[in-house]
Structures are given as C-alpha cells and as structure tokens.
Amino acid sequence: MQREEKQLDMLLEAVLNRLNDLKHSIGVMIHRLETEYETINWPTFLDNFALISSHLTGLMKILSTEIGTPLRNLTVLPLMLTPERDEALLQLTEGRVPIFSHDLAPDYLRTKPDPGAESRQAAHEAKANNLTVEASMKQVAQYNKVISHVWDIISKAKEDWENESSTRPGIQQTSSMADTQALVAAVGLGNGLTAPVGPPTGAGVMIPPAIRQGSPMSAVSPSGNAPMGKMPSGIKTNIKSANQVHPYR
C-alpha cells in the first residue's frame, strides 16, 4: 500500500511539473501575442508553439506509462463544498477559482464533455455516418478542386516572384571609375588643368612668379617710392620667365 501511494505521489508530482511548464509556455505565448503583436515574426511564433507541443507530448507520455495505479481507476471527491468565497482556494488556483460550491463542482471535476457539447458531437457523428459514398466522393472531389485551384494560384505567384527576382538588377553603381581616375590624375599630376587667362591685373595685385613677366626684381614699391630702412637680403632669388612651361598645363 505504501509503495502504491509513493508511486502515485511520484506520478502526480511529474504531472504537476509538466503542467506548470505547459502553463508557463502558454502564458508566455499569450503575453507575446498581446504585447508584441506588431513585431512578433512567424519563426518566433512557431518556436513557442513547438515548445507547447513538446510539453503536451511529455505530459501524454507520462500519463501513458501508468506508473503504479492508473489514474483512470481513481476517483476524485470534493472534501468540502461551500457557497462562500475561499481565499485559500483562490490563492491555490492563482485567482481562477474563488468558490467551490455545489453548482460549480460538477463543472470543475467533469472528465467528460458538457452534456450539450456531447449531444452536438453525437449529432455530427451520426450525420457523418449516414453520409453515402457517392456524396462523400463528390465532396472529396470538390475539396480537391479547391485545393488544386489554390495551388495553381500560389505556384503562379511564386513563379512571378522568381522571375522578378532574377531580372531585377543588382546594386546600382553610384560612381564612375573613369571619373575617379581622372580626378586623381588632376589632383596628383595636374592632368587636364590650365592656368586661368584673364584681363591684365592692376597695380597693387600680387601675381604669381610663374605668370609674371620676366624682368629683374625691382625694389620699387607699387606707389613708386623706394622702401626706406630695408636691409639688403643675402638670399639670392631666381625669377623664372613666363614662357616656361607651366607644370599644370
């Protein structure tokens, strides 16, 4: 007797742990659907669904092993029924069951479908059993026709998408290699650059030595007066003539 009770406790503990994992996975999935419905993607949804499915499979596996006494041979009886609010029961069920009364006990402890749902299910099963072979084959043919039509639409859309993807050009080129090389040659070697030709400059405007006319350096200022108090420079200057080839020409 003690062995059977111990096995029953182990079975109930394993079932309870699996149910808690299942409840947590369902809660996480519902929370994501309520808060991340705009950003959740299909792979994430499938991962959550696969996790729930694995918990259900594990639960069914535990129940199918039937460690000790099968649960189907046991009977669950309520120890206390009251129409008043039970705070301990509310805390135990995490706020789901506040009252365990005579009216609610059959619904909570029911192991079979609701009588109304059971009657509707029986009516559907009877209707399916009374269906003739010809009618069933006709419905199957119509179903296959609809499936084929949907398949053709999807295949055509896939083919159009593949054709569009194959004919779509790659990344558009935003630069020209020839222009880049010409720019580098102009900056580094001066290719293609010419000196600007403009009107004669007036007095007092500084002219580059390479463009200035070849003449000996004059110590006379633009105003025509010789500089006063200027020390002679010991650095020799070499004024290039203007007819020399410009390095950027």
Curated annotation (Swiss-Prot):
Q: Does the keyword Coiled coil apply?
A: yes
Might you report a single GO cellular component term? Answer: mediator complex
One Gene Ontology term of the molecular function aspect: transcription coregulator activity
Cross-referenced Pfam families: Med8
Stretch forming the signal peptide: none
Q: Where in the cell is it found?
A: Nucleus
Region Disordered: list its residue ranges: 215-249
Keywords (A to Z) from UniProt: Activator, Coiled coil, Nucleus, Transcription, Transcription regulation
Q: Which InterPro entries match?
A: Mediatior_Med8_fun/met
Composition bias of kind Polar residues appears in: 215-224, 235-249
Output one GO BP term.
regulation of transcription by RNA polymerase II
Q: Please, which domain of life does this record's source organism belong to?
A: Eukaryota
Keyword Protein biosynthesis tagged: no
Instruction: Locate the coiled-coil region(s) and give their ranges.
Output: 1-26
What is the recorded function of this protein according to its Swiss-Prot or TrEMBL entry? Answer: Component of the Mediator complex, a coactivator involved in the regulated transcription of nearly all RNA polymerase II-dependent genes. Mediator functions as a bridge to convey information from gene-specific regulatory proteins to the basal RNA polymerase II transcription machinery. Mediator is recruited to promoters by direct interactions with regulatory proteins and serves as a scaffold for the assembly of a functional preinitiation complex with RNA polymerase II and the general transcription factors.
Q: How does it assemble?
A: Component of the Mediator complex.
The record's listing under PANTHER family reads: MEDIATOR OF RNA POLYMERASE II TRANSCRIPTION SUBUNIT 8 (PTHR13074:SF9)
Which family is this sequence assigned to?
Belongs to the Mediator complex subunit 8 family.
The molecule here is called Mediator of RNA polymerase II transcription subunit 8
Origin species: Anopheles gambiae
